[in-house]
Amino acid sequence: MGMGQEKHTDAASQSRDPEAVAAHENDQLRQRNHALAKALTRATEELRKAKAQLEQFMAPPLTMATMVRVHRCSTDEHGVRHASAEILNGNRRQIVPLSPTVNPAQLGSGQGVLLDANMVIVDSCETPTTGPMRAVSESLADGRLIVSDVGGNRGVVMRASAVARTPINVDDRVVIDPSGTYVLSVLPQEQAQDLLLEETPDVSFTDIGGLDEQIARIRDAVQLPFQHRDLFDRFDLKAPKGVLLYGPPGNGKTLIAKAIAHELAAGSGNDGVFLSVKGPELLNKFVGESERLIRRIFERAKELSGAGRPVIVFIDEMDSLLRTRGTGVSSDVETTIVPQFLTELDGVESLDDVMVIGASNRIDMIDPAVLRPGRLDVKIHVTRPDETAAMAITRHYLTDALPLEPGRDADALAASLVRDLFRRDESRLLATLDEQGRRRGIYMADIVSGAMLRNIVDRAKTKAVKAEILHGSVSRDDEPQGITEARIHEAIDDEYEQNRSTINETDPGQWLRINALTLAADGV
């Protein structure tokens, strides 16, 4: 027998050794048991998850309610706590028990609580921050608040514990719970500063042309009292509380207000402040909100007027905010806005450095109480420019420093512009309006304004720029460079066509009122 056969015989005999076979089988069983244990663990975990989900699905629903107060909390001789609480469940007040797991000391008024099917408080939840919005009308001494809704209906509410120490002022907006019992949160206010254009103007009276008479009047009304207070005191003369600038649109009312703020600042040595707000921006559909914004504007003016700093409060489009009450022309919102404005205006007498200037295209629509002496004392009519004033205005925008037509100066071009604009012939006839048997021809001269003159000059400048771009710097005999008389007349033609289209597309009567015109019979 060879050596290879002997080794094979020994290996076979060893493989048939009972101990080795038993050890091998034990290893296999151990591996199977380990795998079964893992499978059993996974199955147990899955069973637990399924049971938890089943318990969740089978759990009764919880009802949300609002906590009012702890009604009773005591401990008997066995050490068992007995506690109950008063809650608001919808509009129903109920007294319900507290679960032993709920700490009564951690429940505050207005807080949300959860009730189980047996009407037991089993948990608390966050105080809701959504619900009906109300405006605070009055704060009572005991901490309660009088609030009003959009319709003006008033009610008394209490503070939830979450806002017990939060400062709440009149006019603040608050969120109340659905039952109308608790204030849950205070909303951030819409700041009047968001509506104000607050600036230090750099416009002076020298920048305004054609309004010498109006400038002289507003200097006397506003600038003298600010800069010569000692003389006014000696003569027992009070400064006017306000000035109303009225007249057709686009004729410099805002520029005059800015210029007076600039002049007052220069005279006082401090930076003057120009607070500008448009009347329609103050109108708000929520009751009391417009009045609150008016109060905030005057409060802001008072803050800025410290240390002799002059402040101009400029209210544009005043006729939209302070319309005549009781005429049926406006909604009843003016019945509260006008008195609030008058109250603030009457209080301006204690503010030596605050002046109110209003601007309006329709003085006939402003409430008479606003216009009476002692309120807006000075009324200045900013009229449409005549030919002399139009020449002065045009020269502010058309100067010799601009690239002009060779051989022409700014005076000659401005005079040509004004002559063309004030012609009363068919080429400048915008429309013939007829209302209730009265006919009138409306010409460009009837609606000319400072804004229109500037627009015409800008049109001519644009035409000159386009010509420069098209032809470059090459001079051509057939088309002179710069602002030419021909381009100015083309600009007037463009303005004429634009205004004629506007008249034809609008109601004639309304257009006349907006532009402060009347239909006087003139034989046209």
Swiss-Prot record:
Keyword field: ATP-binding, Coiled coil, Nucleotide-binding
GO biological process: modification-dependent protein catabolic process; proteasomal protein catabolic process
Coiled coil residues, start to end: 22-59
Gene Ontology MF terms: ATP binding; ATP hydrolysis activity
List of residues binding ATP: G250, N251, G252, K253, T254, L255
SUPFAM superfamilies: P-loop containing nucleoside triphosphate hydrolases
Residue span of region Disordered: 1-29
Superkingdom of origin organism: Bacteria
Listed InterPro entries: AAA+_ATPase, AAA_ATPase_domain, ATPase_AAA_core, ATPase_AAA_CS, NA-bd_OB-fold, P-loop_NTPase, Prot_ATP_ID_OB_2nd, Prot_ATP_ID_OB_N
Gene Ontology CC terms: proteasome complex
Description of how the protein assembles with itself and partners: Homohexamer. Assembles into a hexameric ring structure.
Family, as annotated: Belongs to the AAA ATPase family.
The protein's name in its UniProt record: AAA ATPase forming ring-shaped complexes
Lineage, broadest ranks: Bacteria, Bacillati, Actinomycetota, Actinomycetes, Bifidobacteriales
